[in-house]
């Protein structure tokens, strides 16, 4: 099932050209407090001991985007920015109901609309009633000013959405836009299966699973884990 939530507890500097760091984008948006530790973290650290690092007690929610219009047509989608289908919207609502009582402080999504919209729709079901807002991460000063929330009170009811290409779906290269069944007929089922499921073999002009995993892991270790360590509850809305 798409847009389902997987709950887990505890536990790169951004390389996007023209993008500021997540910390800087938080400050620019008027959300400085997200760069601090969560309210319960200090007490947890004081109680920690031994060789193991203390747990932050933070939640991590992993969510796959709802069905896209190309999923519905059995097309290779990859990094093409295809919207959700009607079914995908309903799946996002259903996923939101499943995590309605799980605390969420910050959301990470890919740069693709289907992952962002899934997260935004899901959060409309959340018990907190907080508003998910996409952060502007560019360097244009006018755009930074225009996108800033100037009310500190309102800012504390915002759940920031951080977009990054490092969480994008695997790039399928020259397969993108083609029907999966038709590609199997023209290139052979074994070859297409290898392109899709081999860890090291990439489709023509695309990414292997190994390449995809490297960029995702680097982003998680350098950006997501520090948020969890600060005690912030994180949701990632991305791809399978």
Question: Regions from the language model: what does each represent?
Answer:
Residues 78-96:
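Short catalytic helix/loop segments, enriched in acidic residues and glycine
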Residues 75-83, 178-180, 209:
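Short glycine-enriched, charge-decorated loop/helix-capping segments at active-site entrances
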Residues 85, 89, 112, 184, ...:
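Amphipathic, non-transmembrane alpha-helical scaffold segments
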Residues 4, 10-11, 37, 42, ...:
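Phosphate-coordination/substrate-recognition cap region in phosphate-metabolizing enzymes
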Residues 1-10, 16-19, 24:
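N-terminal mitochondrial targeting presequence
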